[in-house]
């Protein structure tokens, strides 16, 4: 960090300093010494470039900088991860906390911390020290729950995905079992994706896009990587973290974690996408009560059900109260519900110390071999990974935790827990999964779809693998789109890959609109819909199936698509089809046309006319730093051209109207986006939704909104020579 020293020596940067305490405690003195080993440089976008003498120092600075930008999100992630949300939010979160506590036990995590290797323990110590020093130097910040961070807590949130495996457990069914509330069994709260699937409502797609291009397909013969996570907005921060011990990672870090989750260093880059791998299993346990104890059948024996007590504190108007639960486990895992007289146990990957090791060590990988070595830890359970490196290697890793199972069972459904043949037998190695290294196509991708099209003709073959390696049974619209923009091209560059990532084609409508047009054409002239829909049909007939801020057909198609799939969803579910496919193949002409009439009426009612440009509907707005954002049609907002990814848009913007609004506001989709070129030196461009800071008064709260909305990625300042002309502040933790 010679650049920083020169700038300070020349007096070009002013560093605000906090007055030292007169009588610091020993802990405060220790933290101040540690802080002096850390330098934080904020660039002209407010992005922190953190440097520490050791990796532990760098971790200290990284989490300190995150706390500066949005302590609320940092704390909330760990409140949730440790099952303490009810302490902040009250009684309504009791069963969410119980779900977490079934898997996350403080005593177990403390023991794992104590037995961790010294290098990992040092990182966890630096993590806790950085957050505690932030709180000590910012007494105006009042934590909701966690007033003091302990090193073991880092193990409670050791993998950076937006939706962890634990969240697959349905809350209502958990409450029905443990809360003695049988009515909850049939209730749908809308808090779990499973609830919406059961109602036949298409979910807003979550996940991500990852693309790697081999040198043979690029203009400058350098590997390229697209990093395009689709998450809720402001879920991750953009950072760079470096040390004198070889750490030098740039990318997106989930608030509160000390590793770059999706990003790159000078040698390699990695991108995770949500996977269709079957990594979680449910077991139907045959349980009998003998006396006052429960036993479950396993093979020819009856084993005792393990019983323990979990206590969940919760906030009330007069202080904390608590609710205790007797919880049950078999060797398969905790009991999470009852089904047809059987208890259901769930088994999933739960190895926090190993997961934290993998999450961190991959950020220091220097080539494919060392990256693959970290992947053999098999703890990134819910994700696929796209990889590229400076040597020109590109790779696809399908899932990262696939238990080896007996293929005769249907593992997408609960299996008989009494049958010993349903046991796991280790996990599949990387080479036993649908894995790709340097495919002859010269490209590979994943958009949360199956791996059977990951590299065009070079893709893995479905018949070579057991069914449980992938649960998807059809190609996704984004998958079709990705193949279209990646195939048969040898002229990729950073700019060309960015353009592909924002290509405006909507493949779903290219399939859905023609049956609608045919239905209209078959209408007799006397039908009232013939005249009512004539102009709308003309717009859709002339449309090129591409989104754009000025596009009226985009507005009409999206409103119609939502309406027609909503109408056919119950029947589609009954016959085992997606609503989109049902609308294409089986919807009646009347259903299609009535949905278009309803969509037109909705547009007219909300916006004054059905002929409304997409820019007047689809908006990005950031008014406050609240985790659950408020929206207001009277407030400032930015038009966004790209749509929800459910229609096949690679660039994703999950938007809808909110109470009191007519306009649609986005809350998920494209978040951190980067394109990286691995040449003799790294070159990258990136953008973050809104801005780096979570504070509404910061100049970096919403300074990237226009770039975000238009896909105008900015240059990344990876090297000190780049950062030199774009530095806003340089300081040690505690000095501002």
Predicted regions and their residues:
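Acidic, low-complexity N-terminal propeptides/linkers enriched in Ser/Thr/Asp/Gly that mediate export
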Residues: 120-226, 231-232, 378, 390-394, ...
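Substrate-recognition/specificity elements adjacent to catalytic centers across diverse enzyme folds
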Residues: 19-236, 244-246, 251-259, 264, ...
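Hydrophobic alpha-helical segments
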Residues: 251, 336, 380-489
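Solvent-exposed, acidic/flexible segments
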Residues: 102, 113, 117-128, 228, ...
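Glycine- and hydrophobic-rich flexible loops that cap the catalytic core of alpha/beta enzyme folds
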Residues: 246-257, 263-267, 272-415
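Proteins synthesized as precursors that undergo proteolytic processing into mature forms
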Residues: 357-383, 390-391, 463-515
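Hydrophobic h-region of N-terminal signal peptides that target proteins for export
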Residues: 5-16
